[in-house]
Amino acid sequence: MFREYKIYKFFEQVKQETYKVFWPNKKELIASTLVVVATVFIFSLICLVLDYSIHNIMQLLLTIGK
């Protein structure tokens, strides 16, 4: 019985905390999403360029050694 009370108390506290959460409006949510998508795109391009460069450098070094 004590265990059931602890579970009940836990979920009551969770419910209380959800009322304290700041929920963004649609405009803020869209702006944040665009920032995340743009950041991921930029870092993906950086990784692509670095990967391509390292690949070409390694190919050059391997062909020089032959």
UniProtKB/Swiss-Prot annotation:
The chain crosses the membrane at residues 29-49. One of its GO terms (cellular component) is plasma membrane. InterPro entries: SecE_bac, SecE_sf, Translocase_SecE/Sec61-g. GO terms for molecular function: protein transmembrane transporter activity. The keyword Transmembrane applies. It comes from the Bacteria. It is found in: Cell inner membrane. The keyword Endoplasmic reticulum does not apply. It is a single-pass membrane protein. Keywords: Cell inner membrane, Cell membrane, Membrane, Protein transport, Translocation, Transmembrane, Transmembrane helix, Transport. NCBIfam families: secE_bact (TIGR00964). Belongs to the SecE/SEC61-gamma family. PANTHER family: PROTEIN TRANSLOCASE SUBUNIT SECE (PTHR33910:SF1). Component of the Sec protein translocase complex. Heterotrimer consisting of SecY, SecE and SecG subunits. The heterotrimers can form oligomers, although 1 heterotrimer is thought to be able to translocate proteins. Interacts with the ribosome. Interacts with SecDF, and other proteins may be involved. Interacts with SecA. Essential subunit of the Sec protein translocation channel SecYEG. Clamps together the 2 halves of SecY. May contact the channel plug during translocation. This is Protein translocase subunit SecE. It comes from Rickettsia prowazekii (strain Madrid E). The gene is secE.
